[in-house]
Structures are given as C-alpha cells and as structure tokens.
Amino acid sequence: MVNLEIRLKDILEWVKTNDYDYTLSNNYNPNHIINCPSTTKDAKDNCISFSFSGSSMAGVLFSSYENNSMLSVLTDNPKLDFIKCVTEFYPPEPCDIIQGENVKIGKNCSIGSSGFGVVRDSKDGSWIEFPHYGNIILGNNVWLGDNNTITRGTLGDTIIGNGVKTDCGVHIAHNSIIGDNCMFAAKAMIAGSVIMGENCWVGPCSSIINKAVIGSNVFIGIGSNVIKDVPDNVVVAGNPAKIIKENKGLWNSVK
C-alpha cells in the first residue's frame, strides 16, 4: 500500500482548484497528514476514501452527503472523483506478493497485476482507471496451475487461503477472498470482490459474478454461471446457477 505524507491543505487546494463543494470539520488541521487511500470500512483519520452512504473515519471523504470527516468533498459521483484525486496524489507502488510455505506456481502465471477496474466519466463518457493499491496474499500449501491470473486488490488485498488448489487457466479477480482448501478446475473465472468460504469446489469453465458471497462446502458444477450469493452446504449448477441439492459431504478426490 502506498504511504505518502500528503498534507490536508494540499488536497484542499486541489479540491478548490477543481471547483468541488466541500465542508471542513471543527478539528480541521491544514498540516494533518493523509498518507494513503483506503476502503471506507478500514479508513482512519490519516486516510482518503469515498462512500455512497454511512459514516467513515477517513480524514478525507468523497461522498454525496455531509459527514464528520476533516475534509468532506461533496459530489454526485464519489468514486469517480476519489479516483481523480488519488491518481493525482498517490501513485501505486509495485504489488507485494506475500507467500506462505510450500507454495507452487505454474508456468506463465500473472500474479499481482492491476485488475479490470474502471469508472465512466459522466462528462465525456470516457473510462477512468481505478488505481490498484492492494497486494496478493497466498496462504500455505497453495498450488496454482499454469496460465493462472490473480490480480491485486484495489484498496484492500486479494487473499488466497491455505490449501487452495487451481488448475490451468483460472482467473481470480481483484479483492477476492478465497477460504481454505477450495479447489478450482480449469478455466474457472472468479470476478472481483467475491468472498468464498472453505472447502468449495468450482467446476471447469464456471464463473462467479462480482461481489457474490459463496458459503463453505459448496459444489459448483461444470459450466455454471453463479449470479447471486450461495449458502453453505449446497450443490449449484446451470446458467444461471441454481441450488439442485444439499451437499451432504466433502468430495474426497479429483479424477
């Protein structure tokens, strides 16, 4: 994660130059350091973030509503304007790949590149890249097959749990969190910000929509297209994937 000493007054000057509406809290300090972008949930008063609803501890917050941040930037498109600001002040550092013990990585893998994150600029219709600041965490006993792609997180990390195994051609997108001992057959595609429990099987050529929450002990059949959350202990299959039965026990081998 980038960690720079940018003063609050420098960001405020940028906000004024670009004609944003803003409010300052009673504890505004022009020399307060804002040193990193952050998710709203994890933000502290030294962070810059964005939000569409709810409160945040961020020192600088782009949002569509007034809040208690030291500098609150008011905008109809918080994510887009947050991107414009952090692109100006916080260039991403190279991705760190943090590996546990006994990690095996196949040939021609791409691990730690930026993911496919863009936001449309409503003024001219162009697509603006969301800078990626997160890292990759690979647990113990992770095996990655040939031609895998695992992209770094945007503001948080992409996390692969202990004992995860992937076949060739698997794609796991930014911000995904994969639980322990999950298995991914060839050409499985996991979109961004998926959260998956433990002991799951993802069949060949199947896909999971972004931000889906997949429970533990879930079996996803070959070629399935998962477009919503999946509870624990079920078998899903089809396009779109549907629950077809209870998953009563762990699969014990791959043949």
Task: Report each predicted region and the residues it spans.
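Terminal amphipathic alpha-helical/low-complexity segments used for targeting or macromolecular assembly
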Residues: M1-E129, N141, N239-K255
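Structural signal for interior beta-strand "rungs" in well-ordered beta-sheet cores
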Residues: E93-A237, A241-I244
